[in-house]
């Protein structure tokens, strides 16, 4: 069984985080391609990435301090 992932865009506005689910239950290549398209359309670049403690979420920081992307592994069950 292939792992599935969600793509989430987190935007900070006036110290409030707004989470937008962009894609759900997709293959990793599909999620990464969509994130790349969105970065290009917003003229952003990835400046660094980090992992959560369990390694199920990758956080991508962009050149805009108010926008990050998260790729989250979907857990079965």
Language model features with spans:
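Short, mixed-charge low-complexity intrinsically disordered segments
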Residues: 37-77
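Generic structural motif
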Residues: 10-12, 26, 77
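Short aromatic-glycine-(Arg/Gly/Cys) micro-motifs in beta-strand/loop hairpins
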Residues: 1-19
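Short, surface-exposed linear segments at secondary-structure transitions and domain or protein termini
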Residues: 28-35, 77
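A short, exposed loop/beta-hairpin motif centered on an aromatic-Gly-Thr core
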Residues: 16-30
